[in-house]
């Protein structure tokens, strides 16, 4: 060291070697002072150790000096190892930085949008930039062909999300494939191949560890980034799933690379005993947990057995963290620190959930549930504290405390609310409309049918329920700033429309609707079961008639009965009839023709013979039209655009909620309508499923 190192280099190198001894052996090097009395003449008399001697395993009983060649090889070995350690740290931080930049972009966009909506900032340039982003990136789906999407059932993923995910994977692949330096005379490895396998395995593991806190953060519903960026939970959940898939690939590569390295470098004799080491087999537990967690999180499994998915997913998440806790210390304490953010994020999310539950719900709160057999729909009503006004379009997580799975919670969109304030009590009644599927809703239906009262109407079953809600969640949107609000709804997504209409009802009753620009509201609803429509009309829409009678706001409803499109053309089917009879002033009302549908349109208030045009079946306030078949969404939106071209405001609020295929078409319709320079379209697509 005296011969090849400078004074500063000697001190740094000695400190580095001493640190290695402390970390790996738990001891310190002997002090440098023990060789202070060694002279240069004595050093020259020592044998010279060469690289060839190390290969032959030569033994010396005296002190030796290192030749120039071996020193250079040793220097290159240590330098290359430290260089690879630094690179895998930096590359892992680069992935975290990538998501930081994405969140920063979303935050800036959300802030600018807030300034523009609040009239603080009015800039044509900023408006054009925002319109450009929404038209070409934020809203359009990956595929722009409707028929292709229906044939291959491709998801309606927004283009910007797809671009972000693609860039993330490209960066991950590049960081995994570049900047390796292997040489044959490495003192740590016997072969170049084992050297590469070790470097690849270590880098893959480092990328996984750096990804974990981000993946955990994006999975929580009480994520502060939701508020900062204005993105919905579905966006972060999409990112969470793709980060998880990247982690599964990287952890598989890490495990295979390290196993190949250990087997080739050590041989079977030393490789097999490794499986008895705690850090080794717990690493296998963590790797298998991540891979299985990703496989069981596939869409078919989530939809078919969601309850099982939830238990398995959380169990594997815990097993992953426990496995990493025992596996990572072998590489030092640096990587163990990445476990704590995951625990902190999870704990914060659960704490906020508990706070929300205690804040909103009363200990002796009243809840009820009613099941309608014909519509196969459940209406939940639960009373909560009057803390804040309910937000239209928001959703809550519902807990069923009498269930054996009381820890589960399921999200449902708020369909309406009632505010009660008397001398004795004050509360808000939240109303949810739930289409019965498998899992929680099916179990709830079974409970209602099992406890059915003889006095209850044969078409429904109702009872008190022990329920609590946690929320609200979801992004804010106000369609009443536009002259026309168009709701394009599919199936149970009607709760989005009824929720916004409840907000408008409150504005009308308080007289605050005059501060809004809204003049026309049109709801286009595609529904399979006519009985579902009848139930919604009786419980929600019938009340709109009296409220809007004193206003100049036009209400219209187009109901597309998709079940009829599957029937034979010779079949006839009774359509729902409103219980309230039209008054004298509406008997001679002109027929309201809806935009074209994807099948032949024919309708009447009683029977549906083939080949007839749609006929109005509503009263004077809510003009209702029934149409057989599915709506052609592009034609629906285009007809509203044509109407607005001759108006003063020329602004349309387009709100959509429906299955993946409908959401895909709604996005495409917005893109096409946004090309019209005369009419401004404000777009909002509410989540249909989770």
Residue ranges and their predicted role:
Residues 83-101, 133-353:
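Membrane-embedded alpha-helical bundles of multi-pass integral membrane proteins
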Residues 122-149, 366-385, 566, 570-596, ...:
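Non-transmembrane, juxtamembrane loop and terminal tail segments
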Residues 51-77, 318, 437-441, 446-452, ...:
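Reductase modules of NAD(P)H-dependent flavoproteins
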Residues 40-72, 110-151, 429, 608:
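Extended, low-complexity, polar regulatory segments
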Residues 367-462, 527-528:
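Ferredoxin-reductase
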Residues 103-124, 217-225, 298-304, 347-365, ...:
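Transmembrane-helix exit/juxtamembrane "anchor" motif
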